[in-house]
Amino acid sequence: MHLFDRRQALAAAFATWPLTNLLGQNQTKDPYADGKLIDGEPPLPVSGSFTLAVLPDTQNYSERFPATFLAQTQWIVDSHEKRNIAGVLHLGDITNNNRPVEWENAQRAMRQLDGKVPYFMCPGNHDYSEGGGCKDRTTLLNNYFPMSEYRTRPQFGGAYDKEPDRMENTFHTLQVADRNLLVLALEFGPRRDVVRWANEVATKYPKHEIILITHAFIYSDDTRYDWRKYGANQKWNPHAYPVAKATQDDVCDGEDLWNLLISKHENFILTLNGHVLNDGLGKFISKTPGGRSVPQILVNFQMRPKGGDGWLRLLEFNKDRQTMEVYDYSPTRKQLNVSEQNRMTLTLAGI
């Protein structure tokens, strides 16, 4: 089956499954029919490389399966030395309904990393408004991950200059394996003035390799979110949410961010997002005006049994400074998924 056909089939299957199936109850179909699972952990990285761990869409763990969330971050702590895990990237939808009990579960899981592995977070649509409805920009994120705790950490670089005491839009720097990295974490559907600030950050750090994390950027058909071109044919575009209507469409999707931010600089090396259902996976590579190829990656496991089955993504940056190994591993299943969408080697453009 061709890749696009496979995705269409998966999308149709997920569309007809009841929610209880997605959360691991009453399943009658094989949830890993599209996978290639093998037992064990990824091979240990070679000396001189480093790893970033990616946690997408933990909303179901925060709501219903907190033990899985705890198992993920504990595995990262237990593995960070032998794998040289330099940081953890959370891609948003930290919670499902923006409720205190869910934030408490998320806080408990992420706090296991404190003092061991730095972590960087961006909010998703479910982290906003009462019930996670994303009707406005209100969120409990700052109640449980307050700026006062993060601004003194050595990796912290700064926050959106109009909201210096809030965590929705931040950047962080890492020096690892003789490389200078900058993680730029932006809110769901970033506001235009947030993008203005992000441009200033990218300009200020021209020698840093920038990784953008934001909740919605590319879609599961391997294209960027583009409201003007696709409209509602790409589900869950930030422009389609109540917050857009409430703010005179002051939101940016993936195409907006490419045109207004990434394409204006030659130091972005990678984008990462979650958010999208269907098969929850995607990859899109496009060139900047300077001819540099920038991989854009979608990863989301929330449709798997038990809210995600513990899957996380490991990005191993090779010492050649040109390639990155991608592994999907579940600490709770103690398995790898080595299908073509889950295990790959990507080329990264230097700066």
Where are these regions (language model features)?
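N-terminal secretory signal peptides and thylakoid transit peptides that target proteins
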Residues: M1-W17
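N-terminal active-site segment of His-dependent metallophosphoesterases
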Residues: N26-E102, A232-N233
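Extended active-site neighborhood of metal-dependent phosphoesterases/phosphodiesterases
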Residues: D30-L37, P100-W197, K204-E209, N237, ...
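A short C-terminal boundary segment appended to hydrolase-like catalytic domains
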Residues: V46, K306-I351
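Residue-level marker for buried hydrophobic side chains located in beta-strands
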Residues: L52-V54, V88-H90, M121, L212, ...
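Active-site environment of divalent metal-dependent phosphoester hydrolases
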Residues: Y61-E63, N96-R99, P123-G132, M167, ...
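Conserved beta-sheet core of the metallophosphoesterase superfamily
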Residues: M121, N237-P242, A246-E316
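Active-site-proximal segments of metal-dependent phosphoesterases and phosphodiesterases across multiple
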Residues: R196, Y205-F268
